[in-house]
Every structure is written in C-alpha cells, then in structure tokens.
Amino acid sequence: MNTRVVSFPPPIDRNPYQALLYRHLADQGVEVGSAGRFTVGWLHENRALVTTLHFHWPEYYYRFDRGPHAARGLLSWARLVLFAVRLTVARRLGYRIVWTVHQLSPHESSSRRLDRAGAWLLARSSHVLIALDRSTAGALAAELSGSAARVRVIPHGSYIGVYPRGRPRAEVRSHLGISGDAFVVLSFGQIRKYKQVDVLVEGFRAAHIPQGALLVAGLPLDGEESRHLAEAAGAGREIVTVLEFVPNEGVAELFDASDVAVTTRIDGGTSGAAVLALSLGLPIVAPSLPAYEELTGGGRAGWHFDSGDAGSLAAALRLAAASPAVRAKKARAALERAERLAWPEIAAQTAAALRPA
C-alpha cells in the first residue's frame, strides 16, 4: 500500500522545517496530501485517500485561544474531549498516527495539566512517536508511561543550502550600525517569553566584551519581552534589534555578519535556530542541556553555560570572544555537525515510521 500522509497542522509558511521534510519524503515515495481538517467528518471522507496522520504541534487541536480569557480554560477542556474522540475515531478507522515531538510541552502554557493531558492522549493513540533528540526520547519514556517502545529518535534536518547568502558582511554591519571589528553575538528567532530575553541581555552586559554587540533579530510575539528589548536597545548602542519577520533573503546575511549565535531557551527539545546557526557555519552559545550538548557534539561546535544563569552566560560569551582561532575551529565543527543532519537519511527514517505496518 502506498503511504499517503497529511500533516497536522499543515506546513507553516514562516518555518521551512515541514516543507523540507515533506519534500524529501516525496523522494522516498511518500505521497503528501493537502491540508486536512481533523474532524470526524474529514476522517470518514478521506479514509480511502490517506493512510497516515502526522502530528507536529497537537496544541492546535485542543487549545481554545479566542474570546474572553475567563472562558478559554473551560473551552480548552471541551476541545480536549473532542480531540480524544477524534483520535479514537481515527484509530478505529485504521489510520496510522505518528507524532513528531518537537518538545514534550508547548513553549508557553496557561495550563500544564491541560497540555499534559493532550500529550498523554496523543501519545497513547500514536503508533510511533518521533523524538528529535535523545533527551526528548528519555522525557517521553519517563513522563508518558508505556510509550518507550514506540519512540524513535530521528534528528532535525539541517538548513544547509536553504537560504541565499545575501550581502557582504561589511555591508550588513554598516547597515545595522555595527562596526567592522565588533564581536557580534546573534540571537535569532521569534521573540517569546520562553526565550529568556532578560537572561540574554543581562548575560551579554555582564560579559563586558570590548567592542561587543548583541544583535537580536526576529518577529516579536510577546509584547512584554519586546518592550524589554526595546528598552535595552535604547539604553546603549551595543544592543541592536531587528524586531520583525526576517524574509528568506535576509536570514543568512545576519549569520554571516555575526561571530557566534546564542540561545537561552530552556524548555527542552531541539532548537531550530541552533540547527540553522550550525548549518550556516556559526558556532553556538547554548545552555548545558542534553539536547544542546548532543547538537554541538559535546561543545566541539560551541560553548555551554548553566541554564538560566546570566553570570554563566557572560563567562561563556567571554570565552567565545577570547580567541578567533578557537572560533574558527568551532565554526568548522558547526558545519560538520550540520552536514550529519542530511535530509535524505532523515526522510528515509521518517518514511519508515509513517508507513502502515
């Protein structure tokens, strides 16, 4: 039987991960269907056309994020009941269900109990759970009893060759008001609470790097975090912000204009922004968490600091700034780490997980 898969949610335009995955799955003979609606009616209507339901972020299907805040909790629990019913119908109709677990809990949560229940329901209903790293696989086995035998570790693919290189380094720095001899630390990605912007700014300032510059680029999705960044940028020229969605043609040039990339998120799971940095040959400064240590090869492609500790981050940034020769060595290692995340192999493993037994 041919494998015909539908993604839930459909591929997100502003994140190329899903598009890259399904493009390479097509090369493996997997047919990728158009956007599906996870309803009982859709499940019945498409049973002869679709073999596999592939979930990525299940919170889209049980959270209720509209209307009065006071009613959202109750309505979310009602949606969770519908989610459970639909999963039960999907199993009884014979669909294969696969969940790629980007992180065990959503980035921001108004109810950990709700999100834990949603994860438990989907994990129980899934034939296969795909973890992007070993630490997520371990968390799945520990927190969702009975899931260990169904977990497969298939890493996040690289972004090598996805983004055009863009303008020269000197031109980009000049445009941003950053001097040519500055040591530039890049934080790239959506501005959200779980990214710990306060730790990032405090750690950078505590590092006291001569001619250091912190470049923060990404779409602001959290008003409080964005205001904090704007205030920090207004207090001194060493912090530069590009608080907007960065189009594809502008992504690589920001990394090329920087010396290291930094991430301060501690929610677990594999960071797509960290994979992007490695793919563009930029070493990363990241928390000492198993997923990041796995990604950097135990620090060969970056530096690590104690999670949530601004002082430890400052020390790691000083180390990164201290030696251009060490940075160059780690930059080569970064690209080598990214080259191991080849999409053809990842797609082959994912295709095997998606195929009906």
Region annotations inferred by a language model:
Residues G298-G311, L319-P324, E339:
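Conserved acidic donor-binding segment of nucleotide-sugar-dependent glycosyltransferases
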Residues E253-G269, L282:
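Acidic donor-binding loop of glycosyltransferase active sites
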Residues V246-S258, V275, S279, E293, ...:
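Short acidic alpha-helix that forms the nucleotide-activated donor recognition element
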Residues S179-K195, V201-F204, L215:
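Conserved donor-binding/catalytic core segment of Leloir-type glycosyltransferases
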Residues A325-L354:
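A charged, aromatic-enriched C-terminal amphipathic alpha-helix characteristic of glycosyltransferases
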Residues S226-A252:
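Nucleotide-activated donor-binding/catalytic signature segment of Leloir-type glycosyltransferases, i.e.
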Residues F188, A213-R227, E244:
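Glycosyltransferase donor-sugar binding loop
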Residues G138-A142, S158-H175:
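Acidic anion/phosphate-binding donor-loop and adjacent secondary structure
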